[in-house]
C-alpha cells in the first residue's frame, strides 16, 4: 500500500533528524531524551541523589536520562500503562496510576519518601481532530498535576508537556496555585511545527 504524502514527509524528517541520529549514537531510546537533557542543563532539576517519578515513561528515554544522573543515591520510578523494556536503575510499574492497586505498588516502592521531582512527557494517541486531542492531552496533564500534588515534597518540582490551546491558561493558573514559580520551556529538540511546550513548576508549596 502506498504511503500518504504526510507519512512520507514524516519519514523523511525522521531520517534527516539530527536528534534521532544522536539518540542512536548515545544509546537513548528516543529523541525526546534531548528535550529533558536541555531543560535539565538550564534548570538543574535532576542531580545526583534526586528521587523522581517519570509518568508515561515508555519507551524510556527520559528514565534513561534520569537514571544516569541520579546515580546510586537517587531513585527513578517509571509508570506507564504500556510495557517498557527494563532500564538499569529504574523501578518500572506497568498500569494506570489512577488505579488504587498501581498507586499502592508505587507507594510501597517509595517507602515513605516524598518525591523531589515529577516529570511527565505524556501525550494521548492523536485522532487528528484538534479539539478531541487537546481535551485528551489536558486530561493527562491534570492527572499528572494531581499526582505531583499528592507525592511531591515541599519545595519539589514538576515538569510537564502541554499543548497550547484553550485549556492552557486554566491549567497554568492551577500550576501557579501549587508552585512558587511556573516557567515555560521550549527545548531545541522539540520540533518547530509542534505546539508542545513544557511547563516547569518550581517549589511545591
From Swiss-Prot:
Keyword flag Transmembrane helix:
no
Which top-rank group of organisms is this from? Bacteria
Question: Metal-binding: present as a keyword of the record?
Answer: no
The catalytic activity of this protein is classed by the Enzyme Commission as: 2.1.1.166
Q: Name one GO cellular component term.
A: cytoplasm
Please provide the record's keywords in A-Z order: Cytoplasm, Methyltransferase, rRNA processing, S-adenosyl-L-methionine, Transferase
Binding residue positions for S-adenosyl-L-methionine: 60, 62, 80, 96, 121
Q: What is its main location?
A: cytoplasm
InterPro entries named among the record's database cross-references: RNA_methyltr_RlmE, RNA_MeTrfase_FtsJ_dom, rRNA-MeTfrase_E, SAM-dependent_MTases_sf
Q: Which family does it belong to?
A: Belongs to the class I-like SAM-binding methyltransferase superfamily. RNA methyltransferase RlmE family.
Query: What is this protein's function per UniProt?
Result: Specifically methylates the uridine in position 2552 of 23S rRNA at the 2'-O position of the ribose in the fully assembled 50S ribosomal subunit.
Its protein name is Ribosomal RNA large subunit methyltransferase E
Amino acid at each position: 500500500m502506498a504511503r500518504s504524502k504526510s507519512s512520507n514527509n514524516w519519514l523523511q524528517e525522521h531520517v534527516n533528524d539530527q536528534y534521532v541520529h544522536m539518540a542512536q549514537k548515545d544509546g537513548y531510546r528516543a529523541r525526546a531524551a534531548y528535550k529533558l537533557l536541555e531543560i535539565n542543563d538550564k534548570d538543574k532539576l535532576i542531580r545526583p541523589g534526586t528521587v523522581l517519578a517519570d509518568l508515561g515513561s515508555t519507551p524510556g528515554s527520559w528514565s534513561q536520562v534520569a537514571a544516569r544522573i541520579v546515580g546510586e543515591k537517587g531513585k527513578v520510578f517509571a509508570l506507564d500503562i504500556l510495557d517498557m523494556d527494563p532500564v538499569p536503575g529504574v523501578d518500572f510499574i506497568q498500569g494506570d496510576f489512577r488505579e488504587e492497586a498501581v498507586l499502592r505498588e508505587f507507594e510501597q516502592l517509595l517507602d515513605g519518601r516524598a518525591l523531589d521531582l515529577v516529570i511527565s512527557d505524556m501525550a494521548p494517541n492523536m485522532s487528528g481532530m484538534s479539539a478531541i486531542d487537546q481535551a485528551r492531552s489536558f486530561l493527562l496533564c491534570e492527572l499528572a498535576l494531581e499526582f505531583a500534588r499528592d507525592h511531591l515534597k515541599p519545595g519539589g518540582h514538576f515538569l510537564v508537556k502541554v499543548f497550547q490551546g484553550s485549556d492552557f491558561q486554566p491549567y497554568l493558573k492551577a500550576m501557579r496555585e501549587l508552585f512558587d514559580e511556573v516557567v515555560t520551556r521550549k527545548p531545541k529538540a522539540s520540533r518547530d511545527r509542534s505546539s508542545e511546550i513544557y511547563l516547569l513548576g518550581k517549589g511545591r508549596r
